[in-house]
A protein has these predicted regions:
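Bacterial N-terminal signal peptides that target proteins for export
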Residues: 4-24
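Sec/Tat signal peptide C-region and signal peptidase I cleavage site
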Residues: 33-39
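Extracytoplasmic small-molecule ligand-binding "clamshell" domains
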Residues: 40-110, 118, 279, 292
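Periplasmic-binding protein-like
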Residues: 51, 128-132, 223-224, 230-270, ...
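Ligand-binding cleft/hinge of the Venus flytrap
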Residues: 57-60, 73-81, 142-174, 179-202, ...
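Extended ligand-binding regions for polar small-molecule ligands
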Residues: 70-80, 136-158, 162, 175, ...
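Short helices/loops that flank or line small-molecule/ion binding pockets
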Residues: 74-79, 87-88, 92-106, 119-121, ...
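Acidic, polar ligand-binding/catalytic clefts
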Residues: 78, 83-168, 237-249
């Protein structure tokens, strides 16, 4: 469990996001793996965030980045005494930019998955959140029950079949909107593309516009993303629908992403994140931005 203007797992909507769109990006990752490891004195670190996946990260009036992740980043960077410079970057350019040395760290509600770990190093998770469907017509999927615990999906098709089959019946013949390149994109395609139309969007806000306008029937994203964004006036007709879906299918949670050779930098952030989890800083920021505890 993190472009909108979006984003979410790379996230993690949950608005967690992931896309390696070109062979060039993969080649760059391979070249990075082969490069010799050299010690580096980290005094300044450039961190890429989308700046459009509220409340994880967003662009404030005046252009400054705010949200859960920028505030957490400021805290952990202070702990390791490193100057962290935040820059806004669309999701699709994050991985290539990291591998090219444009950024040192990615922080965008990126879900940690085995596939991503093949080319990236991840910090320990600083959050873990479930996902949900959203609709404007609760005849399609009933409104989510307040306070209901998340249904845990394992990623095993047989084990997850009862939950997925119930949703397939409700979404048969419908159009589902999903942001491109997220951990949720694969789930939606694998589970529903044979019975529903899947429409992919570059950002979550673009998808939400189509949901409100009736151009799609349902969307899927991180619970924390929707909990914040359905409060906006323009999204007043959107409601969370069906069960919250969590569990191992999304991986251990959201983490920072690094180049493979930067294990020393990862170690610094791991220690700082651990301290922020232990002293309640993460929970405090989560309560502020998500109105719920997302500590892993």
């Amino acid at each position: 469990m993190t472009n909108f203007n979006a984003r979410r797992n790379l996230v993690n909507g949950k608005r967690i996001k992931w896309a390696i769109k070109t062979i060039g990006a993969i080649a760059a990752a391979a070249a990075t793996l082969a490069a010799p490891v050299q010690a580096k004195e980290w005094k300044t670190v450039t961190v890429a965030l989308e700046g459009g996946y509220a409340p994880w990260n967003l662009t404030l009036p005046g252009g400054k980045l705010g949200g859960f992740e920028p505030e957490l980043l400021a805290n952990v960077c202070g702990r390791i005494k490193v100057q962290c410079n935040m820059v806004a970057q669309d999701w699709d350019g994050m991985i290539p930019g990291l591998q090219a040395g444009k950024f040192d760290v990615l922080m965008d509600a990126i879900s940690i998955t085995p596939e991503r770990e093949k080319i990236l190093l991840f910090s320990r998770p600083y959050a873990a959140t479930p996902a949900t469907f959203a609709v404007t017509d609760t005849k399609i999927i009933p409104k989510a029950a307040p306070g209901a615990p998340a249904v845990k999906l394992t990623g095993d098709a047989n084990a997850d079949k009862p939950t997925v089959d119930a949703l397939r019946k409700q979404l048969k013949g419908k159009t589902i909107g999903i942001q491109s390149g997220t951990v949720y994109t694969k789930f939606i395609n694998d589970s529903f593309k044979d019975i529903a139309s899947i429409r992919v969007y570059k950002t979550s806000p673009e998808r939400d516009l189509d949901l409100v306008a009736g151009r799609i029937d349902a969307s899927f994203d991180d619970v924390t993303y929707y909990a914040a964004n359905i409060e906006k006036k323009e999204n007043a007709s959107i409601v969370l629908a069906g069960p919250k879906l969590g569990g191992p299918i999304w991986g251990p949670g959201e983490g920072l992403a690094f180049r493979k050779q930067d294990a020393d930098l990862k170690a610094k952030f791991d220690a700082a994140i651990g301290a922020a989890l232990a002293d309640g800083t993460v929970k405090k920021l989560a309560d502020k931005w998500f109105k719920t505890d997302v500590t892993p």
